[in-house]
Amino acid sequence: MRSHILGKIELDQTRLAPDLAYLAAVPTVEEEYDEFSNGFWKHVPLWNASGDSEDRLYRDLKDAAAQPTAHVEHVPYLKEIVTTVFDGTHLQMARSRNLKNAIVIPHRDFVELDREVDRYFRTFMVLEDSPLAFHSNEDTVIHMRPGEIWFLDAATVHSAVNFSEISRQSLCVDFAFDGPFDEKEIFADATLYAPGSTPDLPERRPFTAEHRRRILSLGQVIERENFRDILFLLSKVHYKYDVHPSETYDWLIEISKQAGDEKMVVKAEQIRDFAVEARALSERFSLTSW
């Protein structure tokens, strides 16, 4: 796992509370890449390429600065964090995120953009604790704690889940560089850069051949009508068992083959490629159209 803690700030709960209340009240709309999730998944753009409050698409900024949206003036504490904790020179986007009773399927980000993936640098900070909310990055599952500033290696296979209805609002701030860089360059105050903290990594159970056999037995019940549901079910397995999240797609393809439905096999292969291999900017994928 390359994801790691960069530092930590003490969140002022009194100042944070009205910001979180405002973000919670922003209407939920269909998200970019909404097919990656089920349940409640919400992004509120604070800085983006256009300054448009409805623009949720991440895209490369070259020779241009990220623009604040109208939401920024309603979240003064988060505005202060973004502008004083971070150096805005290479800022691409800043947004709040929330996930409740939902999972984001394993995927890779930045595959639709122009820079080398190592030039993108995503930070993630949980703003409120949700004990059943987790991230995964390659072979590791993480429970992020409020105030921890994480580098989230979104260029590798990763996922997120919240097994509860307890809100888990967070702040995601993205940077991009044109050449080699030091990760501490993202901070306005170099003293905030304090890597090396011990993360909270939940223990997972061993994954055995018997577990795999049981998963593949879903080939007896999968249909086009529940294909999407089974994908999201499979995406949760690696949070409880010590298995790589990309196995989700290997299982889905094998289960589809057992069903004897060639269109289902093709769709399983296509969602794998769309999620972790390559896709065009703004390209969408349907899990329910056949």
Swiss-Prot record:
One of its GO terms (molecular function) is proline 3-hydroxylase activity. Binds 1 Fe(2+) ion. It comes from Streptomyces sp. Optimum temperature is 40 degrees Celsius. Is stable below 40 degrees Celsius. Gene3D superfamilies: B-lactam Antibiotic, Isopenicillin N Synthase, Chain (2.60.120.330), L-proline 3-hydroxylase, C-terminal domain (1.10.1720.10). Homodimer. The keyword Zinc does not apply. Belongs to the L-proline cis-4-/cis-3-hydroxylase family. Keywords: Dioxygenase, Iron, Metal-binding, Oxidoreductase. 2-oxoglutarate binds at R168. Disulfide bonds: none annotated. This is L-proline cis-3-hydroxylase 2. It catalyses: L-proline + 2-oxoglutarate + O2 = cis-3-hydroxy-L-proline + succinate + CO2. Its EC number is 1.14.11.28. Fe cation binds at H107, D109, H158. Inhibited by metal ions such as Co(2+), Zn(2+), Ni(2+) or Cu(2+). Is also inhibited by EDTA in vitro. Its cofactor is Fe(2+).
